[in-house]
């Protein structure tokens, strides 16, 4: 009788019929960092700034689809990578940077695409107003052979160029770094850079990693070699971090050099991590990064301040194709260099923090994606494929979740499943961000339409008072996708037990979990309505219910 009463109350209370909540903000608790999140759907020219309930604060438009990352600058303008066609056609292609003011007016642009070079994936806006542009540069098969490449072919090594913007378009190049200046090869002593990669761990083995397509990033005729997908600048250290996906490594280089110095030994890698096999100091078993994206230094005030964090995509990871968020502390010395002992690889040997604690198939994006540390100690995660954005605490509990409703064919309404709604990366900015000063932050309705689910904003960042308030109400619970076909992810802000009933009150599944989310196989369930009841483990929390729909 108790279960039937619970079921009937749930069916009456929930606002939708057979369709459930499929897009927009699925979860927003008081433990999430309250701020404004950039959502930049990859297949469109639109960029939206939303609050934690998915309500739109501002929108910028462009004639170009997303070409990778975008950022808010401290004057309230949006800096965005744009996709343009050209001689280079690999995954993550950009080619143009645009800067638009708060009112969506173009105030500066840079075209960085010709037959010799092409911007891609990312850029970094520096405190001095300059911009670091990540780009491919062309090397012919003849140049590859002269550098010692076995089976030489067209290659696109990476370059980073610092540009001082001028006027409304373009700027002056003030610094450059080229990966091609820092090679090593062990195949021909008569060619430059001869030596064993293991003896030159600060250089890049010209014969490591495949080039081109064949299932990887880029087209069949691509010269994409390193496939860097992120660049991050640390002004305190005056160092640059680079994510090189094809090498499964993070590199750090010194920015405190002249361009001439950067072309010599001073421009060699200061540090590298993720795959010791890339420099002959390990094998496949030592690899810890698997097609990673994004890299950021964690800022001061965060529990892991000073460490590095990446989205470790996990394609080809032993055991499962599963993503993780990995944080580690590079062995930096007082002079800004990094410890390297004997013939050992760069450390460390253990993570400072990782999410989830055990990789699970329910969390996976084979490409794109990123992570941003939050001021309250949480991490904002972009699971790029499928446009899923969510926030987790230090304990691994999910406290905010959002599904991008906008894809290549427009915005879907609530209750419908989005298509091609990928998001390259996302960033959140707190209420005190300088770019918001004097701006109209009045929200309009969410992209997907009116919020009938009753999302509430939680502006207080006092986690103690937030927890106290949360004890007065049922915990927010969510299910995705809903309707579901074969697999269903259930999420709650704390551990507990899930009970799922069919419309006759029969118990279908019981699942006790210590994590924020759990994956349920529903492939064999008959089509129809179900009710999930979540009973929190913590005393004082009442149970909560959620309507589910199964439709094969």
Regions found by a protein language model. Name each.
Residues 14-20:
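Sec/Tat signal peptide C-region and signal peptidase I cleavage site
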Residues 20-464:
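Histidine-/acidic-rich catalytic cores in large beta-rich domains
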Residues 7, 470-552:
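C-terminal outer-membrane/trafficking sorting elements
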Residues 459-475:
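Low-complexity, Pro/Thr/Ser/Gly/Ala-rich linker/spacer regions in secreted
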């Amino acid at each position: 009788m108790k279960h039937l009463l619970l079921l009937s109350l749930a069916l009456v209370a929930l606002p939708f019929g057979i369709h459930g909540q499929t897009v927009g903000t699925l979860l927003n608790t008081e433990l999430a960092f309250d701020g404004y999140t950039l959502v930049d759907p990859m297949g469109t020219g639109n960029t939206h700034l939303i609050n934690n309930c998915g309500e739109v604060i501002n929108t910028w438009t462009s004639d170009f689809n997303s070409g990778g990352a975008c950022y808010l600058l401290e004057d309230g303008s949006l800096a965005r990578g744009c996709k343009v066609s050209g001689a280079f056609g690999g995954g993550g292609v950009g080619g143009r940077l645009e800067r638009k003011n708060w009112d969506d007016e173009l105030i500066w642009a840079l075209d960085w695409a010709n037959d010799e070079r092409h911007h891609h994936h990312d850029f970094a806006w520096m405190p001095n107003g300059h911009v670091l542009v990540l780009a491919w540069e062309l090397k012919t098969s003849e140049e590859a052979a002269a550098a010692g490449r076995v089976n030489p072919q067209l290659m696109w090594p990476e370059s980073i160029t610092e540009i001082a913007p001028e006027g409304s378009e373009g700027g002056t190049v003030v610094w450059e770094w080229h990966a091609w200046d820092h090679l090593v090869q062990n195949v021909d002593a008569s060619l430059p850079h001869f030596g064993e990669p293991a003896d030159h761990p600060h250089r890049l083995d010209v014969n490591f990693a495949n080039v081109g397509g064949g299932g990887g990033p880029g087209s069949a005729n691509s010269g994409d070699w390193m496939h860097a997908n992120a660049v991050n600048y640390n002004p305190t250290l005056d160092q640059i971090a680079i994510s090189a996906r094809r090498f499964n490594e993070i590199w750090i280089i010194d920015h405190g050099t002249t361009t001439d110095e950067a072309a010599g030994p001073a421009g060699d890698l200061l540090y590298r991590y993720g795959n010791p096999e890339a420099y002959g100091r390990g094998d496949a078993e030592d690899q810890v990064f698997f097609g990673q994206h994004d890299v950021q230094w964690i800022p001061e005030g965060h529990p892991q301040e000073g460490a590095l964090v990446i989205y470790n995509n996990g394609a080809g990871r032993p055991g499962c194709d599963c993503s993780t968020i990995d944080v580690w502390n590079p062995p930096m010395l007082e002079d800004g260099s990094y410890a390297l002992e004997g013939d050992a690889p760069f450390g460390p040997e253990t993570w400072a923090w990782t999410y989830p604690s055990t990789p699970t198939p329910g969390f996976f994006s084979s490409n794109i994606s990123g992570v941003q540390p939050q001021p309250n100690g949480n991490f904002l995660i972009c699971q790029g494929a499928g446009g899923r954005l969510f926030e987790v605490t230090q304990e691994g509990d999910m406290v905010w979740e959002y599904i991008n409703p906008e894809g290549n064919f427009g915005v879907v309404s609530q209750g419908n499943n989005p298509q091609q709604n990928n998001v390259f990366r996302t960033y959140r900015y707190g209420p005190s961000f300088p770019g918001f000063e004097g701006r109209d932050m009045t929200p309009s309705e969410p992209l997907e339409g009116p919020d009938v689910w009753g999302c509430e904003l939680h502006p207080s960042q006092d986690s103690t008072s937030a927890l106290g308030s949360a004890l007065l109400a049922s915990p927010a619970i969510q299910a995705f996708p809903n309707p579901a076909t074969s697999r269903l992810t259930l999420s709650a802000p704390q551990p507990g037990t899930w009970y799922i009933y069919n419309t006759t009150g029969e118990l279908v599944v019981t699942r006790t979990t210590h994590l924020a989310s759990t994956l349920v196989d529903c492939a064999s369930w008959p089509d129809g309505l179900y009710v999930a009841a979540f009973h929190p483990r913590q005393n004082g929390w009442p149970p909560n219910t959620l309507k589910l729909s199964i439709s094969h």
